[in-house]
Regions:
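N-terminal pre-core extensions flanking Radical SAM catalytic domains
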Residues: 1-123, 290-339
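Preference for well-ordered, secondary-structure-rich cores of eukaryotic proteins
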Residues: 25, 31-32, 55, 59-63, ...
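Leucine-rich repeat
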Residues: 67-71, 129-147, 164-172, 189-190, 193-194, ...
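Core AdoMet radical
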Residues: 94-106, 115-132, 146-162, 172-187, ...
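Conserved C-terminal portion of the radical SAM core fold
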Residues: 147-152, 178, 199-203, 224-339
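Distinct, well-ordered alpha-helical segments
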Residues: 163-170, 187-195, 255-260
């Protein structure tokens, strides 16, 4: 069956997040667009889980049966997303993806593109929120709603200093997880999860190849410590790909030749052969024509350097048109031997 959908909807993705008013929600999407399928995170664990399952069923029915965009209710916002495309539709109604990105959660970084409050989080609020989140997760597991091979993504602040780290790691024991980390602190339990679960991984948004640019983007002068901790995680891996890196391109800030070539050298040391090329999503839907030219030009340069070093990349946050333009420009850069 072919119908308009996206990968996250088909996985019944459970994204613990915050809306624009900073209210906790569970959504089937993590795009920064209005009217995405979501529920408010209010009530008991039983009530919240019922609301989520019911929302998934309504979204599933709409994807299967509604072709006219003007008649959409639960996926009304999805039509503005580049990921919402005609595709073979298959949904077993189990949760195959859990993304824990709810706040307040502590993080040592001061990334210039991050909109999360830089102040210390309200511990009382954080405790109450994560008590409820863990109750929902434990109930979903107990009721068999989460697929055994589900992918867990932990991206709330920094897991190594999270107040609920121990309880989260207990849930994740023996499960496939990707830990979004700033690598400022090495975590033995995360390293053990990598060793025990070949499908687990860590992801660092490295965003720089030099100490100077790292300091500019992240707010800390500790790039050597970051690369040291990356190497320590690498020692605990059992297959290629368990160390994954992302590069958020910000034209005029971190798009120099030295940064791009240096990050490739770091990838070689860690046996990383793939890089996610990303963007500052705050202005994803409000960029000027010149902004788009600058972004795709920088992405093309990085893409070309990766290709020349037999490395691959993805550009999930770029539209199909932007990706096409990046590849065309990269091929031209390579053909003209500009790198």
């Amino acid at each position: 069956m072919v119908c308009r959908s996206c990968g996250l909807i088909q996985m019944n993705a459970m994204n613990f997040n915050n809306d624009k008013q900073n209210n906790p929600i569970i959504s089937l999407c993590c795009e920064n667009i209005p009217n995405i399928p979501q529920i408010s995170f209010e009530g008991t664990a039983e009530e919240i889980l019922y609301k989520f399952v019911n929302k998934c069923a309504k979204v599933d029915s709409e994807c299967r049966n509604i072709q006219n965009n003007s008649k959409r209710i639960f996926t009304k916002g999805c039509v503005n997303c580049s990921q919402f495309q005609p595709r073979t539709y298959n949904n077993d109604r189990l949760i195959h993806y859990i993304n824990l990105s709810a706040y307040p959660s502590p993080c040592q970084c001061r990334c210039i593109y991050c909109e999360v409050q830089k102040n210390e989080p309200d511990i009382t609020e954080s405790v109450k929120l994560f008590d409820n989140i863990i109750a929902v997760l434990e109930l979903a597991l107990e009721q068999g709603l989460i697929a055994p091979d589900a992918r867990w993504q932990i991206s709330s602040g920094e897991i190594a200093i999270h107040p609920y780290r121990d309880r989260l790691m207990k849930i994740l024991k023996g499960r496939n997880a990707i830990f979004y980390t700033n690598c400022m602190k090495f975590d033995e339990d995360v390293a053990q999860n990598l060793h025990d679960n070949p499908n687990s991984a860590i992801n660092l948004s490295i965003d720089a190849g030099t100490p100077e640019t790292w300091h500019k983007v992240k707010g800390f002068d500790n790039f050597d410590k970051i690369t040291e901790n990356l190497s320590r995680y690498f020692v605990n891996t059992t297959r290629p790909g368990q160390i994954s890196l992302k590069y958020i391109i910000m034209p005029g800030i971190n798009d120099t030749y030295e940064d791009f070539t240096s990050v490739v050298e770091i990838m070689k040391v860690l046996n990383v052969k793939h890089l996610t090329i990303s963007r500052d999503i705050r202005n994803k839907y409000s960029m000027s024509e010149q902004d788009t030219i600058d972004l795709t030009g920088a992405a093309a340069f990085l893409f070309a350097i990766l290709s020349k070093n037999n490395m691959t990349s993805d550009m999930f946050t770029y539209s199909p048109e932007e990706r096409k333009l990046v590849v065309e420009q990269a091929n031209e850069i390579i053909a003209k031997q500009l790198i």
